[in-house]
C-alpha cells in the first residue's frame, strides 16, 4: 500500500470512470467517464478531514484506503504533510513538495488535497461543478457528458490562500495557478 495520494487511483466515483492518457497534449493521465451522465448528476462525494486527523488515521491503520479531501488550515500543515511523507524514505523532500503543489485545490477558501488522485485536468470549459456543503465536497456534472469523455475542472476557480502561495515561494515551487 502506497502512502502517496498521487499514486492512488481508487477515487470512489459514483459513476464508472477509467484513467487513460489525457486528451490534453503533455498532460499525462486523465479521468474518463465510461457512461453517459446528465447535467446535475453526482459524480463524486468525499468527506473533508484535517491533515492532522488524516495522519492519525494512517498511523492507526496504514492500510486504510478511505478516500478523503484533506484540509490544510495553515502554512505549518503543509510542512507537516511533507514531514509525514518523508518518513517513508521513498521520495526526497523536494519531490514531495512538488507533488503537493501539483495536486492542491481550493473551494470556499479551503485549501485541500485529495488522498487519492482524481486525475482531473484543467479546462476553462470544465464539465464538473464543485459544491462544498458541511463536511463534504460534491462533484456534479455541469453539463451532459458523453461516454468516453475526459472530466475537467477549471483551475482558474481556485482562490489560493496567501499561506499556500508563500509556502510555494519559500520552497521555490510554482503554485498550480502559475501553470495556466
Provide a role label for each language-model segment.
Residues 1-180:
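Conserved catalytic SET/PR domain of SAM-dependent protein methyltransferases, capturing the structural core
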Amino acid at each position: 500500500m502506497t502512502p502517496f495520494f498521487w499514486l492512488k487511483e481508487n477515487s470512489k466515483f459514483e459513476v464508472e470512470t477509467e484513467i487513460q492518457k489525457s486528451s490534453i497534449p503533455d498532460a499525462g493521465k486523465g479521468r474518463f467517464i465510461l457512461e453517459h451522465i446528465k447535467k446535475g448528476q453526482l459524480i463524486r462525494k468525499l468527506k473533508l478531514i484535517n491533515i492532522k486527523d488524516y495522519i492519525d488515521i494512517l498511523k492507526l491503520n496504514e492500510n486504510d484506503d478511505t478516500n478523503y479531501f484533506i484540509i490544510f488550515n495553515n502554512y505549518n500543515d503543509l510542512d507537516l504533510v511533507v514531514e509525514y511523507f518523508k518518513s517513508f524514505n521513498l521520495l526526497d523532500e523536494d519531490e514531495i513538495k512538488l507533488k503537493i503543489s501539483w495536486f492542491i485545490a481550493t473551494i470556499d477558501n479551503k485549501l485541500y488535497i485529495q488522498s487519492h488522485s482524481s486525475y482531473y485536468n484543467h479546462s476553462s470549459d470544465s464539465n464538473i461543478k464543485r459544491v462544498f456543503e458541511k463536511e463534504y465536497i460534491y462533484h456534479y456534472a455541469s453539463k451532459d457528458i458523453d461516454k468516453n469523455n475526459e472530466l475537467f475542472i477549471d483551475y482558474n476557480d481556485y482562490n489560493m490562500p496567501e499561506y499556500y502561495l508563500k509556502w510555494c515561494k519559500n520552497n521555490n515551487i510554482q503554485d498550480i495557478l502559475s501553470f495556466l
